[in-house]
Structures are given as C-alpha cells and as structure tokens.
Amino acid sequence: MSMFNKVVKEFQWGQHKVRLETGEVARQASGAVIVDVEDTVVLATVVGAKSAKPGQDFFPLTVDYLEKTYSAGKIPGGFFRREGRPSEHETLTSRLIDRPLRPLFPEGFYNEVQVVIHVLSVNPEIPADIPALIGASAALAVSGLPFNGPVGAARVAYIDNAYVLNPTRDQLKASSLDLVVAGTERAVLMVESEADQLSEEVMLGAVVFGHEQMQIAIDAIHELVRDGGKPEWDWQPAPKNEALIARVTELAQNDLLAAYQLRDKQARSAKLKEVYAATSAKLEEDALAAGTVAADKATVGNVLFDIEAKIVRSQILNGEPRIDGRDTRTVRPIEIRTGVLPRTHGSALFTRGETQALVVATLGTKGDEQIIDALEGEYRERFMLHYNMPPFATGETGRVGSPKRREIGHGRLAKRALVKCLPSADEFGYSIRVVSEITESNGSSSMASVCGGCLALMDAGVPMKAHVAGIAMGLILEGNKFAVLTDILGDEDHLGDMDFKVAGTEQGVTALQMDIKIQGITKEIMQVALAQAKEGRLHILGKMTSAVSGANTQLSEFAPRMITVKINPEKIRDVIGKGGSVIRALTEETGTTIDISDDGVVTIASTSSEGMAEAKKRIEQITAEIEVGQVYEGTVLKLLDFGAIVNLLPGKDGLLHISEIVNERVKDINDYLKEGQQVKVKVIQTDEKGRVRLSAKALLNEAAAAAQSDTPPQQ
C-alpha cells in the first residue's frame, strides 16, 4: 500500500491535455498541487499561518513565482552557478497570480499566507504562467484556507478573426492579441493584455471567451478538492464592534464630509489626517474616563476608512460631483510640453491634473539591445520602458533604490501599450529606451507614462504608427446601481470596486488591464466602461495631436546616426580580425559603434559623420576583392632582392617584381623604391592561393601609348 494519498485529475483543455495532482509532493504545506500542461510542469504550494500576528491590520499575502533553470535543461550563469534574485518576468508573473487571488480572501482575514510556485519543467511552446495561476488556485482550494475560489485562468489569442484558447508561443507570434483573463465561476477578476489596435468589441469578446473556457479548469479543481482536499478551516471574522462604529461615526462623519468637499489633494489629505488624529484622541479620552482600554489605532483607522468609502461612493451614485468636483465622464486638465531636456534624444512633460510624468527617450544601436536569457531561449529586446515613482511624487518620504514590483508592473503595462505602434527594426534600426519619471501622482501614473512615452518617442524622431494614449477608469457598484468613472484619482482607486486601464490609438486598443475587487461585474458593465474609456482616450489623443502632430523629421544632434554596409558574409571574419583586433581598432580609431549581422549587414553608428565615413571606407577596403586590371595607390612594405611587397588594401599585399618596376633593367631596387614610399601599381595576375602580381611599368607603357594617341591612360 502506498504511503501517499495521491489524487489526479486530467482534462482536455483546448489543444492541450492538463493534469492536476495532489497528495504526493510537499505534504507539509497547507496545500500543494502539481500542474502538467504538455510537459510544462509547475509545483504550486500554499502555507497559511494558523493565527494573525497581534495588531495586524492588513492581509499579508505574498506570491512568489520562481523559474528553475534545470526545468529547461540549463545550468545558471554567474560565478555561483545558481538562481539569484527574481527576473523581471518572474516578478511580473508573481503579480499576475497575486491580483486575482487577493480579492477572494474574506474581509478581516489577516493570517499570513504565502504562495510559492516552482517551474519544474518547461516545454518552450507552453508558457508557464497559466499553469502557475491554475496551480496556485488549486493549492489554495485544497488547503482548506478561507478562500472564495477557485480561480480559473486562460490565455486568449486572436488569429484570422478567431479566438484561440491557450495558444502556443508560435501561434502568439501570428496573433494580434495576447490576453490573460482570470476569474471565478461567476465573475471576471483580472485581465492583462497587449493588442494590435483592436476594437473594444473584439477585446470584450476575448474576455468573455476566456471566462467561458476557464470553467473547465474550475470544474477540475472542484473535483480535486472533493477527492483530495483538506478540511476547511474553522475561521470566523471577528465580530464588529458596533458601539465603536457608532461612536467613531458620531465623532468623525461630519468632519469627513467636510474634508471631501476640499478639491485640492494636499488640503484634503491634511484635513483627513486631522480628523483621524482628533478621533483617536477623543476615543482615548473616553476610555480614560471610563477606565477601559481604547481601541487600537488600526481598528479605528479601518472604521474611519469604511465611513470615507460610504461618503465618496454614495455621493457619486447620487449624481453629486466627485472628490475633485468633476462629473463621471470628465478628464482632468492636460498640459503637454516636449523637448524639455536639452541634451536628451527626446523628452516630454505630460501633466494631467495632479499626475505628472517626465518621460525621456534614448536611441541606441543594436549593441544596446537588452539580452534576455529566458527558459525558452535567449532573445533580444530592442524596446525597453522603465517606470520610476520616487516617494516625493506623493509628498512622502521613503526608500529610493531598485524598482519595486509595482514599478516593474507599471513599466510593463506602458510598454505593452506602445510596442505595437513602434516602427519595425527594418524601418527604424535603433534600439530604444524610454524612462518615465513620475514627478507627481494622484491616480493613473502608468497611463500618464503611456501618453508621455508616445510624445517623447515622437520628439526623439521615432516614426510612430499613431499617437497612443491611456486612461484609467473606475467603478462604483451598489446593488443594481453603478457608476463608471473616467480618469480616476488615487482615492477613487482605493475606495472603488474596479481599476480598469485602457490604452490605444484612434483605431483601437493596444493594452487593457483590469483588476476587479468584487464579484458581480457583468458583461454589460464592462461594455459601458470600455465605451466610456474610448471617449476619454479620444479626448486625450486630441490634446496630444494638437501639441505634437507627428514625429520629428530630424533626430537630436546628440543621437547617434547610422549607416549600413553590405559585405560578403565570408568577409565577416576579416572585419572582426583575430580575437576582435580589427573591429576593436576600427571602433576606437573612428569613434564609432559597429554591429555585424550573420547575413553580412554592417551597421555603423556614431554622432560624428566623419567617423562614420572613415569607418565605412575602411570596411569597404578590408572587404574589397583585388581584381586584375585594377590600379591601386599602394605602400611599399618591404624591399627584397627580386622585388617589393606592396600593400594595396588593409590585409592585402602584392608582389611588384623587379622586372615590373620600369622598362629598363634594374640593378639595385633601392635606386627606385624605398620602404614606406607610395607607388601606383596595376594588378596583372592573381592565383587561386590569393597571390597577387603587380606592375608599375605597365602604367608607364600605357601613359606613353596614351600620349601618342592623345587618349588618357587608365587611372
């Protein structure tokens, strides 16, 4: 009899066979599930603390997605030959898994929960993110933790006007859409996508298609729980302190109402801090007078937050102005300035209300491309977008250093929004880096990065296919009443039920990200949100087009210029030289950057046109073929008894025999030639071994004959 209580569920999911198993591996975790999708295998584990830490006032969920190089049959690079800090892809996938799971834990559950997913085996054609999300959901479901799942997930492509479920990597290359959707049986919770200017109808159809198809995975998880799940935790939320809620409401409600009449963010924040402090102080006085212990500040803060949420939500649903005085459809005032930094290649300052992004574009060569060593193989990225939000952007102090998960995620969203509108490498051979520095933030800084990024690229002279703008939408839903909010503020994001970011052009959507905090968002509500987002996006695009009609026709004087030279691929080694000696000397002496592709295309880049011309000339000389009948101005390298060695081109010498110097007999070659002397010679013979014979007297004879016939000699 086996020592394992192993449970396996298999199902066909689109073009792939999926296997879920639990009960054999990682049995000491609260829950553990292995997911196998056509040889891409992940182990998802969950551990939940049995009790919350004293004073805990938030839900401490961590999700770590870890790729092991052995899964692809590789040994890690680096001195230690082991996996190090998470890659950008691992960080983004961790966020992708976290986002649909977090809303499904019950309110008031503050026990620490850690979800860890290890990628154990990789089929290069099957991305591991969907198996990882399914595995994390299944591990939570079998663990017995209080979790309102399970969650399903699916990737959707759009190929030849048809949706494709969980496409392979090859299929994705031919797709105009890469969309990941996650949700429960009843509702969509998360969407992440990149698209090639698709309509809102196609995008919504993909979300609905993915939600329908994920039900197969959800059913399989239910079966796994039925046969291999652990007993459900006996957890109940702490009873609400109705007396405290009533007293806090009595003390603070009117002051909170007054605070939310202030339209300026900083004034409003200052007033809210006063209300919080005054309420806590009054409660401490009450406790002292009654001889009891006052409620801790975290508990009081949660009650105050709930009152704030009710105030803001009810005002919006009743048709009253929003926090900053706008109606539900108005975009905040926009100011645009380009060329703001004198020596950068392209720059823009994009301000929308109290959100501001200073965005800079830099052009580089092929050598500046990012080399990514992924499990499925090494590849290069010619477009990079990095997002930074320092603490001063929100008027706070804090840590400054390497990017946090949020910054990496916002940068990737902005990159997704812009990448489909960039020119191809054939049309514009530069590598491109965009950096968005958020200098002010009050909602939707990632979408400000999209707008500013597009403007900075155009300022740098990048011929974008179209202007790209982004907008963040919000939602308030109570029963049958709902309101979709255009261009949400930070407070509206915290107090609302949905964060919905849409970026695109006049033609269609290029990126869509959706995070829904509640269940019950219908297709109709998403339809309204998408239509309202399009209205807002077109408004912003109008402002951007008025400010910058198109890309600059001239690159910055500080940007590198590029020219290309086509050489025989067999000559590449001559240009590179032994140990790179030739190309190294070329780049150092001409001040250029030189990249050579396998097909013989040489790209020369420099800010100096003279340096580029010199590098091009020398490369052409190195790769030139010596032809019989050609005349060269050569340099005497060495004198021999029977002639001279003459250098014609870099690395190419020929023999000028003593009998070919002049017509008369030469007794001493030193009477006619010296080492270092420039001499004009004609190629009279080459052989299969590459040996070259030269003649100077042939040119003398031609000159004499030409003089007699008045025909100019060969030059």
From Swiss-Prot:
It is found in: Cytoplasm. GO terms for cellular component: cytosol. It comes from the Bacteria. It catalyses: RNA(n+1) + phosphate = RNA(n) + a ribonucleoside 5'-diphosphate. Its main location: cytoplasm. Signal peptide: none annotated. Mg(2+) binds at residues 493, 499. Residues 560-619 form the KH domain. GO terms for biological process: mRNA catabolic process; RNA processing. Keywords: Cytoplasm, Magnesium, Metal-binding, Nucleotidyltransferase, RNA-binding, Transferase. Residues 629-697 form the S1 motif domain. Its EC number is 2.7.7.8. PROSITE patterns: KH_TYPE_1, S1. GO terms for molecular function: 3'-5'-RNA exonuclease activity; magnesium ion binding; polyribonucleotide nucleotidyltransferase activity; RNA binding. InterPro entries: ExoRNase_PH_dom1, ExoRNase_PH_dom2, ExoRNase_PH_dom2_sf, KH_dom, KH_dom_type_1, KH_dom_type_1_sf, NA-bd_OB-fold, PNPase. Its cofactor is Mg(2+). NCBIfam families: polynuc_phos (TIGR03591), PRK11824.1 (NF008805). Belongs to the polyribonucleotide nucleotidyltransferase family. Involved in mRNA degradation. Catalyzes the phosphorolysis of single-stranded polyribonucleotides processively in the 3'- to 5'-direction. This is Polyribonucleotide nucleotidyltransferase. It comes from Burkholderia cenocepacia (strain HI2424).
